[in-house]
Every structure is written in C-alpha cells, then in structure tokens.
C-alpha cells in the first residue's frame, strides 16, 4: 500500500469512524464540504458494509438537530460530519440543546492543519473554540494533519469520548485537522479498504466500563431529612435520562410510590408510565385551585422543573424539605435554590434507600389521605373538562391539548414543540401523553430545530405526531432538505395562529395592536398549501375535530410526512380558555 497522505487520511478516517461505531454510533448525518472528504468517503464505505446508517443534509444547523432527535429517540450516540469554517458554527444551537438535555451526540468536524492557522488562509477559523462552552469535551487528532495521527492516538480519543458519554451524557466535539490531498483515487481506495478489512475491521478493542460511584454521605444527609411515614408529594419533571433506561426509572418510581403512598404529579414529557399508582390527573389545575390548602412538608422532585408558573410559585413558597434527584446531570438544576440535589439518579437512590431501610420485599403502603384528596380533586376537574371540551367544539389550542391525545393512537409517540404547546399540554392533556413516548426538548427550551428534531425522532419512533405552532415550524423549514425527510412517517399538526400566540397571552394588555404584531407576534401571511407543495409534502387543512380524527387516520395510513393545518383565532382562544379556568377554579 502506498504511504501517500491521501491513503493515510482515508485509513485513519476509517479507523476513527469504525471505533465510534463500536462505542454506539448507529446513525450518521453527513454535510457537504471538501475538507471533510476523507471522513465522508470513509463513512460511505462503512455504510456499504452495513455498519452505520447515513443520511445527508445540506444545512449543518438542521443536521445537528436531526442527529439530536435520533439520539433522543434511540438512546444511542449519533454523529454529524461537517467541513471546516462557518459550517461548524451552525452546530451551536443543537449543541446547546444537547448539552442542557444531556443527550449524547458527536460533532466530527474537519479543519485545516496547524500550518494554515492564524495566517489568513481561506476558510480557516478558530473553529475549535466555537462549541467549547457547551461541549463536554473538545478533542483533536494530530494538529499537523490526520495523516500524522497514530492508531493508538485515535483509540485514546475514542476511549475518552466513550468514558465522557457514559459518565455525563452530552455533546462531544472532535475537531480533525486534515491536509491535502483530500480525495483518493479508485485504486488507492481499493488498496486501503483491503488493508482495513483484513487488519482493522474485526479487530477487538477493549473499552472499560465506567462505574458511576454515588455519594453515600450525600444520600444519608438527604435521608436524615426525609420522613417516609409522613405525607409528601412526588413531582416528576421532564425526563433527562436515556430512553434505554426508562424501564428501570419507572420501576424505581413504582417502588418509591409503593414505599411512601405519596401522590405523583407527572409532567407530559416525564416518561412516567400511565398505570403508576398515585398519579394525579390535571395536577396543575389542582395546584392552581388548592395550592394554599395542600398540607405536607416534604417534596421529592425528579428531574428539572416543569414549565408551570403555578408549580414554581408553589415550590417557592413551600416551607418544607425539597429533595431533587437528577439523572446523570451534575450541574445545578434548581432555579429556586431550595432543594437538596442528588446527582446519581433514581435507580441509585432507591437501591441505597432499600438497603438502608433493610427492605427485601416491598409492602405497598396505602395511599396517603393527601394523595386521595388530590386524586379526587383531579377527577372532579376531569368531569368539568369532559363536559366543556367535546369533538363538536371549535378548535382552539387548549382543546387540542385535551383531545389530541385521545384522537392520536395511544401507543404512537408525540413530540411537543416549545412555547405554547408544551404549556397547554401540561395544563389540559390529562396525563394523555403517559401512554406513549412523548418528546419535547426542554434543555434550552427554544423553538430552534423543531422540524429537524421531529424528523430525527421519526426515523426511530413512528408514526410520530409533531404538535407545533406556525413560527416554530417555519423557523426550521430547512429540515425538509434532509435526505428522504418527506418519506418519513411524520404527521405535523400545524397550529396556525399567524404568529407567536404566547405573546398574545403575555403582552396583549400592555401594547397597541400594531406594536404587538411588529415586535412580538411577527405574523406571516403564508400560503401553507403552496409551501407544502414546494417541498412535495402531503397537506390537509381541517376545521373541526371530526375531520382531524379522519386526517390522523389518513396520515398514518400513507406512511409519509404530512402537514395537517388547523387555524386558531387568538381572540376566541384567550376568552374561551379564561372562562373555562374561572369555572374550574371556582368549582
């Protein structure tokens, strides 16, 4: 085999990607570019061998979010390959969300070699710094070029990556300087592939298992402040663990509830199973109505706080103890700063708890009087909602939050975009998301990448329903440019209120109509049917819930991407919802 730079670039790219596949990468998004050619060509060859799935995206920003959606839905590492320069900067929004939502994703970026740095060379920037503030690690191969990198250096880089992801999941930036020539001849490629397949492909590598050691003293400190024989509440926020660990999380939660008999408030994206004993339906409305009457002095909080002002007010004024258990998230996670934080997850906490209490067999404790009262209150509110929200009603956002979980098949996954949908579903969905996987990216809680995230999820979990407002949707239309995106089984429920309706709720009373529109709502007169046709996406517009049910059945049956638009009158939405809330709070 020739020892030319092009051959070494290609071989090292094969070795690097092969090792990343061995630590869990199954899906790879490749973006266009010349500097990343050795990595892209190597990825293509590994795809031919059936080792990794590859999808392409011309927009790095969409690619980052698409990869993040795949990671969230699969529980496995995902990977994005980009060229150098501004391409790397476009990964930042997805890196921010991956950081805050603790999802494993690798950004593999090609760079210029050291000799071209800081001298005005074309398309050469300090890209190694672009993602450093949000990535768990920023690592590099030999700065003089990939061709000068040794095999053991690549192995070491991947071992560091695997250890970091296992310990504290999040984004990793691997910045790879590559010198010319970037392409490779057919003959040289054939020769390198023969060497790789003969020597490296089936080579065994040892990756040490990472043992997550808990802090027993911290646990004992927390236990001293808990009295499991007295009343309390379990609050489950957005789930930040791996989807592969959902079963153990829910089994641990079931044990915790059995030991305590406490009621459970579950966020729509908590991933709590719907058959958990003690679940309080309509808990946010129960809290809004009764927050001054809830008599307990201890709270067990799992994960970050839900997007509920009522809950935040309750926690801020709560005078008892608050314990916050996090899933491999080692940063502070309590904005009200009133909790004992435990970093090592619910499974670890329950394991230590059972050992400390010498419990071999759990005897299920009766529901506490507080649990019974809160559950009954939730059921009373449910009766009011059933009476006031029917399939005959005019479509509004809050009615969608209540009825869509009943119209969309109970086992099919849902993704909620940020802004209005997640808040409406928290208030009105009646635990309807708990029968299925429900996703919403609550790390940074932005509307960035909504479509690309949903398309990524739908590669793994489908048929998927995305519930999104119009601004969140158009913010990421480049998602349709991801390879075969229109062929994915994704149904988009497009809530068209001609602007950011959440700002209507926040600022309508304090601004003139023209100011509100220009500064916050930013309405766009879009012909949605023509927009869908431009991307060759199936489209329907519906005006009532009966037609919406039929549209859902149609979208699932055709197994392709579909946009179902519903128009919302913001004025009617606000007055209608306020009247309902007044009836509930006054009941």
Curated annotation (Swiss-Prot):
UniProt cross-references to Gene3D superfamilies, sorted A to Z: 3.40.50.970, TPP-binding domain
Cofactors that this protein relies on: Mg(2+); Mn(2+); thiamine diphosphate
Comment on bound cofactor: Binds 1 thiamine pyrophosphate per subunit.
Reactions accelerated catalytically: isochorismate + 2-oxoglutarate + H(+) = 5-enolpyruvoyl-6-hydroxy-2-succinyl-cyclohex-3-ene-1-carboxylate + CO2
SUPFAM superfamilies on file: Thiamin diphosphate-binding fold (THDP-binding)
Gene Ontology biological-process entries: menaquinone biosynthetic process; phylloquinone biosynthetic process
UniProt keyword list: Magnesium, Manganese, Metal-binding, Thiamine pyrophosphate, Transferase
HAMAP family: MenD
PANTHER family: 2-SUCCINYL-5-ENOLPYRUVYL-6-HYDROXY-3-CYCLOHEXENE-1-CARBOXYLATE SYNTHASE (PTHR42916), PROTEIN PHYLLO, CHLOROPLASTIC (PTHR42916:SF1)
Assigned protein family: Belongs to the TPP enzyme family. MenD subfamily.
Protein name: 2-succinyl-5-enolpyruvyl-6-hydroxy-3-cyclohexene-1-carboxylate synthase
Organism (species): Prochlorococcus marinus (strain MIT 9312)
Lineage of the organism: Bacteria, Bacillati, Cyanobacteriota, Cyanophyceae, Synechococcales
């Amino acid at each position: 085999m020739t020892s030319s730079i092009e051959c070494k670039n290609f071989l090292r790219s094969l070795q690097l990607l092969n090792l990343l596949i061995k630590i869990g990468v199954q899906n790879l998004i490749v973006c266009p570019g010349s500097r990343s050619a050795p990595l892209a060509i190597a990825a293509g060859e590994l795809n031919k061998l059936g080792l990794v799935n590859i999808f392409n995206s011309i927009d790095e920003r969409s690619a980052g979010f698409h990869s993040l959606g795949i990671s969230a839905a699969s529980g496995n590492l995902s990977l994005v390959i980009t060229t150098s320069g501004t391409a790397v900067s476009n990964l930042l929004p997805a890196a921010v969300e991956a950081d805050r939502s603790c999802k494993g994703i690798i950004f593999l970026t090609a760079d210029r070699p050291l000799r071209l740095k800081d001298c005005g060379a074309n398309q050469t920037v300090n890209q190694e710094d672009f993602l450093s503030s949000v990535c768990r690690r920023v690592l590099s191969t030999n700065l003089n070029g990939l061709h000068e990198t040794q095999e053991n250096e690549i192995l070491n880089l991947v071992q560091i990556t695997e250890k970091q992801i296992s310990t504290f999941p999040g984004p990793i930036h691997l910045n790879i300087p590559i010198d010319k020539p970037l392409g490779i001849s057919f003959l040289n490629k054939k020769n390198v592939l023969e060497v790789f397949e003969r020597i490296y492909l089936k080579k065994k590598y040892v990756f040490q298992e990472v043992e997550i050691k808990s802090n027993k003293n911290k646990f004992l400190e927390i236990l001293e402040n808990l009295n499991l024989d007295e009343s309390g509440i379990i609050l489950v926020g957005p789930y930040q663990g791996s989807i592969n660990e959902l079963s153990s999380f829910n089994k641990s939660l079931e044990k915790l509830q059995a030991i305590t008999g406490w009621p459970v408030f579950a966020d729509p994206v908590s991933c709590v199973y719907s058959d958990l004993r003690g679940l309080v339906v309509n808990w946010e409305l129960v809290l809004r109505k009764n927050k001054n009457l809830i008599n307990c002095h201890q709270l067990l909080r799992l994960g970050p706080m839900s997007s509920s002002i009522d809950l935040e007010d309750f926690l801020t004024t709560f005078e008892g103890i608050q314990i916050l258990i996090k899933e491999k998230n080692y940063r502070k996670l309590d904005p009200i700063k009133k909790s004992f934080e435990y970093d090592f997850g619910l499974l670890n906490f329950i394991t230590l708890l059972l050992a400390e209490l010498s419990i071999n067999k759990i005897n299920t404790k009766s529901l506490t009087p507080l649990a019974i009262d809160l559950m009954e209150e939730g059921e009373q509110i449910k009766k009011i909602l059933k009476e006031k929200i029917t399939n005959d009603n005019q479509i509004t956002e809050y009615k969608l939050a209540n009825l869509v979980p009943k119209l969309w098949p109970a086992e099919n996954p849902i993704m909620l975009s940020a802004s209005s949908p997640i808040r409406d579903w928290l208030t009105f969905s009646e635990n309807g998301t708990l029968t299925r996987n429900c996703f919403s990216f609550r790390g940074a809680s932005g509307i960035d990448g909504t479509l690309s995230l949903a398309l990524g999820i739908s590669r793994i979990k489908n048929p998927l329903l995305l519930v999104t407002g119009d601004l969140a949707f158009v913010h990421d239309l480049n998602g349709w440019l991801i390879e075969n995106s229109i062929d994915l089984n994704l149904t988009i429920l497009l809530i068209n209120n001609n602007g950011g309706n959440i700002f209507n709720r926040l600022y309508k009373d304090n601004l003139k109509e023209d100011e509100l529109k220009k500064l916050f709502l930013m309405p766009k007169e879009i012909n949605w049917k023509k927009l869908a046709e431009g991307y060759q996406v199936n489209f329907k517009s519906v005006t009532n819930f009966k037609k919406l049910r039929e549209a859902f059945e149609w979208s699932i049956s055709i197994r392709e991407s579909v946009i179902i638009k519903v128009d919302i009158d913001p004025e009617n939405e606000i007055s209608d919802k306020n009247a309902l809330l007044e009836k509930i709070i006054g009941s």
